[in-house]
Amino acid sequence: MNLEPLRKRVRQYLDQQQYQSALFWADKVASLSHEEPQDVYWLAQCLYLTAQYHRAAHALRSRKLDKLYEACRYLAARCHYAAKEHQQALDILDMEEPINRRLFEKYLKDDNGSRDPSSDWEMSQSSIKSSICLLRGKIYDALDNRTLATYSYKEALKLDVYCFEAFDLLTSHHMLTAQEEKELLDSLPLNKLCAEEQELLRFVFENKLKKYNKPSETVIPESVDGLQENLDVVVSLAERHYYNCDFKMCYKLTSTVMEKDPFHANCLPVHIGTLVELNKANELFYLSHKLVDLYPSNPVSWFAVGCYYLMVGHKNEHARRYLSKATTLEKTYGPAWIAYGHSFAVESEHDQAMAAYFTAAQLMKGCHLPMLYIGLEYGLTNNSKLAERFFGQALSIAPEDPFVIHEVGVVAFQNGEWKTAEKWFLDALEKIKAIGNEVTVDKWEPLLNNLGHVCRKLKKYAEALDYHRQALVLIPQNASTYSAIGYIHSLMGNFENAVDYFHTALGLRRDDTFSVTMLGHCIEMYIGDSEAYIGADIKDKLKCYDFDVHTMKTLKNIISPPWDFRDFEVEKQNTEEAGLAPLQNSTKAPESRPNLEETFEIEMNESDMMLETSMSDHST
């Protein structure tokens, strides 16, 4: 009986996804052919596609086909991998080649010339070997051995340069640094294995690799003209905009992709991250619910839900629950680990946040975000040395990221290196301005305030005021910005303006210790300058409508009693250590006081005026 028509019918049913029909006829063909290896292989394929993994593996291994044929060995291992029996799958792949297999292949070669034992199965040896390396990499990934997983993926790609899955696992999971990605691309034998499509492969690989490069118009080689509108190419461009902090352009591109393909797998994480950055809570809510309804077993669905609860605030427990579900579905899903760390960081749970970030750093060696957030947590726990080290690592991966540059400037400020801090802050500001010519996103407000702080330290009071006023444009109701402006006015001797700004700051935040203390000092100094005339105008300025003249004259002693000489010396030492000159003793005669146009000397520690380190907000 000629079995070829039945074999073709089995393939036809497989192509039509009628797996039960294919299984029925594959079983009959295997019996009719007296269990020819090829027919048993296709029977096992049908069993695998109907999720009968142990039956499929038994069909191959009971006949010792996994020891004779690479394709059967690969399929048997894949069955155990699908059943989550990772060690058994690895044992099959790493099985030593038996002597009888080598004799069998020699016999085939002698009998049929140079016939490949797998040629009848329409599979090349290099393709099967590449598939084995790919599967081995996935198993190592599941066993948390990232080093061997990376090596296996590289080998799979070198054996078969068309094996995009291996390339995608290396790049989308950030398993390689930028330098390692470049070395991998240069090591691929494109000339040997794909002379005709060499230009196409080089373009698609390079387009996916350059995520930290400055986004520019995609240059398509003439031989592959027509890829401009390809969604994968557009997503790669959007990713470059995302990593260069141009979130508006990134959102525009990802929205275009989502209109054409609403569930584009590569686009979804970038689109979700952009929605978080632009604070589009309603859109993220709608998208996350749609994803959970349609793809409940996909980690990106629960990642989207977790990001939504993180964004709305005060829902961190809910966020952790859904992000934990995402990491359970795929424990190598780095973005979910980063967001999981954010849910602890916003509650100042630094140890738990860092544990999540360290997990993300192990999974995403080529991504700068885990390093950035680890450094941020170390900075918040006053460990500036370790913070500087991790920021340095983040900067080596993403040298153009203004968030990282800003945090390096914060560390320099905390170390008292004012000039260095100013350089880093200005560099970050230039990078931001290059994105959209002007600073408009409110997340850059801490950078402007920090520029104001460092300019104040360098006695550039006019510039400092300008930066703080720019910060007020972005976030108008920030008490710390008003107190910073008031502080600069007090340093310049403009006590009337200083009092106004400190009052405004206290109106926004009544428990602001710094503003309360400084308001007392400024009122004291202002009255000292105005003793010649205390009238309704002065009382109005000081918001002291119920005070009589005697109270106004003695307000200094009520607010801050005179210090004795010994106390003054101690305070002077503290302020000098903080980089500030002390306030002159208020009992001195007015003529002995320095010119108010010079530095205003304040008798208090400036530690209450905290530098803002929150520009790197907890985004994806």
Swiss-Prot record:
Pathway: Protein modification; protein ubiquitination. One of its GO terms (biological process) is anaphase-promoting complex-dependent catabolic process. The keyword Repeat applies. GO terms for cellular component: anaphase-promoting complex; centrosome; cytoplasm; mitotic spindle; nucleus. The modification Phosphothreonine is found at T599. TPR repeats lie at residues 4-33, 37-62, 70-93, 128-159, 164-187, 198-222, 232-260, 267-294, 299-329, 334-362, 369-397, 402-434, 442-474, 479-508. It comes from the Eukaryota. Residues 577-596 are annotated as: Disordered. SUPFAM superfamilies: TPR-like. Component of the anaphase promoting complex/cyclosome (APC/C), a cell cycle-regulated E3 ubiquitin ligase that controls progression through mitosis and the G1 phase of the cell cycle. The APC/C complex acts by mediating ubiquitination and subsequent degradation of target proteins: it mainly mediates the formation of 'Lys-11'-linked polyubiquitin chains and, to a lower extent, the formation of 'Lys-48'- and 'Lys-63'-linked polyubiquitin chains. The APC/C complex catalyzes assembly of branched 'Lys-11'-/'Lys-48'-linked branched ubiquitin chains on target proteins. V-shaped homodimer. The mammalian APC/C is composed at least of 14 distinct subunits ANAPC1, ANAPC2, CDC27/APC3, ANAPC4, ANAPC5, CDC16/APC6, ANAPC7, CDC23/APC8, ANAPC10, ANAPC11, CDC26/APC12, ANAPC13, ANAPC15 and ANAPC16 that assemble into a complex of at least 19 chains with a combined molecular mass of around 1.2 MDa; APC/C interacts with FZR1 and FBXO5. Interacts with PPP5C and CDC20. Interacts with CDC26. Interacts with FBXO43. TPR repeats 1-7 mediate homodimerization, while the C-terminal TPR repeats bind to CDC26, burying its hydrophobic N-terminus. This is Cell division cycle protein 16 homolog. It comes from Mus musculus. The gene is Cdc16.
